[in-house]
Amino acid sequence: MINKRSLLASFINLPYSLFITFKGMYITLRYMFKPKVTLNYPLEKNPLSTRFRGEHALRTYKNGEERCIACKLCEAICPAQAITIEAQERDTDNSRRTVRYDIDMTKCIYCGFCQEACPVDAIVEGPNFEYATETREELMYNKSKLLHNGQIWEEAIDLRIKKNSKFY
């Protein structure tokens, strides 16, 4: 037996139900013909800002000599205390250079203070954001890893520093 009240209620709600259904279809069709905003990530990438702060790198001069003068300003200014530097004097010209330069990337907050504090632009944050690792120990960067990053990203880092020189 059909309940008369439920049958009456369904007829009363029919125009509203049709309205809501067609409104949803209209919205769906409208968005169907708009340009897509999602990217097929591994194949397509968004352009990065020139001020993006990614993986750290130590830079060298054109002759291959490292820029870091072991002033330890980056170590002192790091709010996360992620940087550890040990310095030693050279015998040739009595200038200081780093013996050990470590960054614990698990502590780093990517604030960019180390880059701003460096008087010789030795430590920079490059454009690389894809550096996932399988172990935590791989995120403990030593001097050789940082110098290697500097060699890989030197052109991109130079371009970014030139574009952003008025902001530093």
From Swiss-Prot:
InterPro entries cross-referenced by the UniProt entry: 4Fe4S_Fe-S-bd (IPR017896), 4Fe4S_Fe_S_CS (IPR017900), NADH_quinone_OxRdtase_chainI (IPR010226)
GO cellular component term, pick one: plasma membrane
EC class: translocase
Residues noted as binding [4Fe-4S] cluster 1 in the record, renumbered to the chain: 68, 71, 74, 118
Residues involved in [4Fe-4S] cluster 2 binding: 78, 108, 111, 114
Cofactor annotation comment: Binds 2 [4Fe-4S] clusters per subunit.
EC number: 7.1.1.-
Cofactor (UniProt): [4Fe-4S] cluster
Main location: membrane
Substrates-to-products reaction catalysed: a quinone + NADH + 5 H(+)(in) = a quinol + NAD(+) + 4 H(+)(out)
PROSITE patterns: 4FE4S_FER_1, 4FE4S_FER_2
Gene Ontology terms for molecular function: 4 iron, 4 sulfur cluster binding; iron ion binding; NADH:ubiquinone reductase (non-electrogenic) activity; quinone binding
Keyword entries, A-Z: 4Fe-4S, Cell inner membrane, Cell membrane, Iron, Iron-sulfur, Membrane, Metal-binding, NAD, Quinone, Repeat, Translocase, Ubiquinone
Transmembrane segments: none
One annotated GO biological process: aerobic respiration
Compartments it resides in: Cell inner membrane
Keyword Iron-sulfur tagged: yes
Membrane topology listed for this record: Peripheral membrane protein
Pfam families, per database record: Fer4_7
Domain 4Fe-4S ferredoxin-type: 58-88, 99-128
Role of this protein: NDH-1 shuttles electrons from NADH, via FMN and iron-sulfur (Fe-S) centers, to quinones in the respiratory chain. The immediate electron acceptor for the enzyme in this species is believed to be ubiquinone. Couples the redox reaction to proton translocation (for every two electrons transferred, four hydrogen ions are translocated across the cytoplasmic membrane), and thus conserves the redox energy in a proton gradient.
PANTHER family: NADH DEHYDROGENASE [UBIQUINONE] IRON-SULFUR PROTEIN 8, MITOCHONDRIAL, NADH DEHYDROGENASE UBIQUINONE IRON-SULFUR PROTEIN 8, MITOCHONDRIAL
The protein's assembly and partners: NDH-1 is composed of 14 different subunits. Subunits NuoA, H, J, K, L, M, N constitute the membrane sector of the complex.
Family statement: Belongs to the complex I 23 kDa subunit family.
Stated name of the protein: NADH-quinone oxidoreductase subunit I
Originating gene: nuoI
